[in-house]
């Protein structure tokens, strides 16, 4: 999936700057090679998928790198780097993929009792427990098509201690991820934004480069989607204000209508029982101010305590 996204960026760069030679460099990070450990053991998504690539940009090995924005940590300073471009946002919602013989009505009627839902995202796990109070959420990793194959074949998910969990009855996944690997037909149910607020930046592809590499920044600016970039700035400002870490069930999503932006963000505990949310609107050309206001409102409602309780010990 990451390769397909990178190839799309290369096509767009060649379209706006046909004289440049775009070389795609494949990186296998710790998060790619280790498909059994929880991402938290590699420093969260930032440590697993982003940190090694960032080092390559800073060293000059790469001019730029593609990231799924939701995988980029938003609570840490990244001196020397900048998001040079974001692509137009893909559908940001989360969906349910079910094994044969299971329906969404089965889950709702039973409140999830006797069912196992697979995900590796703490936000999705918290929302799953909130929506289906008696469900068992199991650690489930792998590429989108690999996870669906495991579901269909009733395969167990290996754990780093040598054990295993599963098999899963359902998976919660990103709609855009399934679409990219041609598995949109497996979507059994799409959660509304009200039911399951997306992760900050979900559906946005970002291109990061060195902050002082003005030639690369100028080229990336030519493929930048302004609305997507403003949404990224607003949502990531919430993460910065909350100092949310990789194990924090934090969600955030913004929309733009004309000159106005609306932003909603939430913080949950891992069990899904504690839930706080804040929503505000403001000028679309001042996204960070809006994100800061929403983040401060969440802090006033007690977000810091929930986040601290979820912090790894």
Model regions and ranges:
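Small-molecule-sensing regulatory modules
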Residues: 1-36, 40-43, 50, 68-72, ...
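Short gly/ser-rich anion-binding loops that grip negatively charged ligand groups
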Residues: 43-47, 55, 86
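Glycine-rich, N-terminal phosphate-binding loop and its surrounding beta-alpha-beta segment
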Residues: 48-68
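Structured loop/turn residues at beta-strand edges in well-structured enzyme cores
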Residues: 60, 79, 166
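A conserved helix-loop-strand patch within extracytoplasmic ligand-binding domains
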Residues: 69-73, 78-134
């Amino acid at each position: 999936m990451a390769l397909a996204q990178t190839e799309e960026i290369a096509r767009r760069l060649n379209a706006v700057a046909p004289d440049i030679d775009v070389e795609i460099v494949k990186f296998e990070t710790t998060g790619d090679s280790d498909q059994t450990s929880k991402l938290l053991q590699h420093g969260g998504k930032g440590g697993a998928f982003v940190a090694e690539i960032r080092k390559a940009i800073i060293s000059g090995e790469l001019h730029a790198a593609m990231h799924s924005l939701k995988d980029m940590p938003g609570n840490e300073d990244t001196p020397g780097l900048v998001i040079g471009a974001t692509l137009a946002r893909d559908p940001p919602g989360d969906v349910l993929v079910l094994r044969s013989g299971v329906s969404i009505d089965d889950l709702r009627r039973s409140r999830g009792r006797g069912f196992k839902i697979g995900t590796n995202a703490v936000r999705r796990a918290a929302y799953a427990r909130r929506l289906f109070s008696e469900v068992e959420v199991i650690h489930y990793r792998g590429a989108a098509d690999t996870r669906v194959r495991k579901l269909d074949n009733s395969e167990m998910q290996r754990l780093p201690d040598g054990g295993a969990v599963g098999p899963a009855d359902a998976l919660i996944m990103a709609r855009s991820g399934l679409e990219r690997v041609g598995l949109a037909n497996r979507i059994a149910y799409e959660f509304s934004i009200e039911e399951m607020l997306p992760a900050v930046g979900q559906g946005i592809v970002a291109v990061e480069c060195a902050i002082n590499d003005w030639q690369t920044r100028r080229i990336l600016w030519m493929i930048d989607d302004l609305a997507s970039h403003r949404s990224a700035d607003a949502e990531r400002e919430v993460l910065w204000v909350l100092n949310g870490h990789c194990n924090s069930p934090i969600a955030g999503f913004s929309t733009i209508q004309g000159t106005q932006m609306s932003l909603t963000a939430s913080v949950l505990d891992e069990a899904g029982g504690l839930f706080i949310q804040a929503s505000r609107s403001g000028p679309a050309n001042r996204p960070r101010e809006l994100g800061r206001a929403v983040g401060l409102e969440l802090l006033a409602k007690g977000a810091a305590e929930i986040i601290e309780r979820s912090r790894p010990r």
